[in-house]
C-alpha cells in the first residue's frame, strides 16, 4: 500500500550532504509508489516553541504562532511516515529540525481528543565524524522520541565522514543506503 511520507530536512545548507541523502531517500520511496513531501526547513520561517501550551484548540491552526509551520501541520497529520533529516551539530540534530519538531507538540500532544496516530519514522543523518560513538546521542534522542510517540522505527542512515557540501557524492554506498530505506518503506 502506498504511503504518505513527510520529510523534515533540517539542513541549513541548501545543497549539503543531508540534502543528497534526502534526494536518494525520495528517489527510493517514490519508486516504490509512495508520495513524498519534503519540507526544506532552512527556507521556512519557523519560530521556536513558546512552551505556552495554548495550542491545540483549532485543528486548522493548532499553534498560536502564525508562521510556516501552518504548511507542515496538515501534511504531518496525514502522513503515514515522518522522516527526520539533519546534519549532526554538536552531537545532535540541527536547530532548524529541533525547532520545527518542537512545534509539532501543538498537534501531537495538545489537541483535545486528538490521539497521536501511530506513525512510522526514519532518520537520515550526515556528519563529519564517522564512528558509532559520534551518533550515539542522536540515536538516543531519536529512539526516545519514537518511543514516546509510539512510532515504529523503520530505519536510520548514518552517513559519516562528510563535511564539505558534496562530500557524500563520493560515497555512493551511503546514498544507496538512503535510497534502499526509501524503497523499503
Regions inferred by a protein language model and the residue ranges of each:
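Short, glycine-/small-residue-rich phosphate/pyrophosphate-handling segment
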Residues: 96, 109-155
Amino acid at each position: 500500500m502506498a504511503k504518505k511520507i513527510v520529510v523534515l530536512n533540517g539542513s541549513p545548507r541548501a545543497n549539503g550532504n543531508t540534502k543528497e541523502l534526502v534526494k536518494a531517500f525520495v528517489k527510493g520511496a517514490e519508486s516504490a509508489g509512495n508520495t513524498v513531501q519534503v519540507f526544506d526547513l532552512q527556507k521556512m520561517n519557523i519560530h521556536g516553541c513558546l512552551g505556552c501550551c495554548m495550542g491545540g484548540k483549532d485543528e486548522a491552526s493548532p499553534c498560536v504562532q502564525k508562521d510556516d509551520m501552518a504548511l507542515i501541520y496538515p501534511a504531518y497529520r496525514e502522513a503515514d511516515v515522518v522522516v527526520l533529516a539533519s546534519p549532526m551539530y554538536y552531537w545532535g540534530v540541527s536547530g532548524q529540525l529541533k525547532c520545527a519538531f518542537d512545534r509539532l507538540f501543538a498537534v501531537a500532544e495538545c489537541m483535545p481528543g486528538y490521539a497521536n496516530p501511530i506513525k512510522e519514522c526514519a532518520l537520515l543523518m550526515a556528519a563529519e565524524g564517522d564512528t558509532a560513538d559520534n551518533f550515539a546521542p542522536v540515536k538516543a534522542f531519536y529512539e526516545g522520541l519514537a518511543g514516546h510517540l509510539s512510532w515504529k522505527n523503520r530505519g536510520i542512515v548514518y552517513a559519516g565522514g562528510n563535511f564539505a557540501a558534496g562530500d557524500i557524492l563520493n560515497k555512493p554506498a551511503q546514498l544507496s543506503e538512503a535510497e534502499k530505506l526509501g524503497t523499503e518503506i
